[in-house]
Structures are given as C-alpha cells and as structure tokens.
C-alpha cells in the first residue's frame, strides 16, 4: 500500500442527489469533486446508480491524472434527523471507482448519528400510516 499516492473518496448519497469528493489523506486539499447535477440534466436522475457510475468514472480519471493509485472510501447518508441509509448511488459509485482502476482501501460509514438531538418530524403521535 506504500507505492503511489492514496486519497479519500467521500461519497454522500441521499435519495435526491449523490456527491463524490476526492481529497488527500488529511482531507484538506480537494483533488476532484462532482455532483449528480453536473452529469445529468433532469433533477430526478441525480441520485440514480447510472449517474453515480458516470460521476465515479469522471472523478477517477481526474484523480489518476494527479497520480492517485488508490482511495479509502467514506460513505455518508443524510443522517441526523433524516434517513440513515445511503441512497441508491453509493454502491454503484464504489463499484465504478474500482472498475475505473483505482484500488479500494477501506470502506467506512460516516453517517452522522444524533446523540438525542432535535425532535423528529411527524408530530406528537408520529407518522400514522
């Protein structure tokens, strides 16, 4: 794992959009970043797995051009008061990064989890289905 430069791929995936940012190992310098809206025109397609795949391919090309050989992946969902499961684009993005020729180090879930934060929406009796 020592040969070549490694980076961190931050993948934020919700049901509305997917964002991929590649930074150096400290997280200070941004190497490449992209969002669903930069790839597709329709807002409904921003979170789709196909869009995430296209985004990952573009970001991987930019990273490889700057000498990155592998990435550690940090997957994040909206978290907090919102859903804690990543959207449909997360898994597709990780697969596409691997297929684009980048080595995958460790995959980590960094979804923010509240330690009894704000009140969830839905009122006193919750969401009645």
From Swiss-Prot:
SUPFAM superfamilies: Translational machinery components (SSF53137). Pfam families: Ribosomal_S11 (PF00411). GO terms for cellular component: ribonucleoprotein complex; ribosome. The keyword rRNA-binding applies. It comes from the Archaea. Keywords: Ribonucleoprotein, Ribosomal protein, RNA-binding, rRNA-binding. One of its GO terms (molecular function) is rRNA binding. Gene3D superfamilies: Ribosomal protein S11. Located on the platform of the 30S subunit. Part of the 30S ribosomal subunit. This is Small ribosomal subunit protein uS11. It comes from Methanothrix thermoacetophila (strain DSM 6194 / JCM 14653 / NBRC 101360 / PT) (Methanosaeta thermophila).
């Amino acid at each position: 794992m020592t040969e070549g430069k490694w980076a961190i791929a931050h993948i934020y995936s919700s049901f509305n959009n997917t964002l991929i940012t590649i930074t150096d190992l400290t997280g200070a310098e941004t190497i490449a970043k992209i969002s669903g809206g930069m790839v597709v025109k329709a807002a409904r397609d921003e979170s789709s797995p196909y869009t995430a795949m296209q985004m990952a391919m573009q970001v991987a090309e930019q990273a490889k051009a700057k000498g990155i050989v592998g990435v550690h992946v940090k997957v994040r969902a909206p978290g907090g008061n919102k859903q804690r499961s990543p959207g449909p684009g997360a898994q597709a993005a990780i697969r596409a990064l691997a297929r684009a020729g980048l080595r995958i180090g460790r995959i980590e879930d960094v979804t923010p989890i509240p330690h009894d934060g704000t009140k969830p929406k839905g009122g006193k009796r919750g969401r009645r289905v």
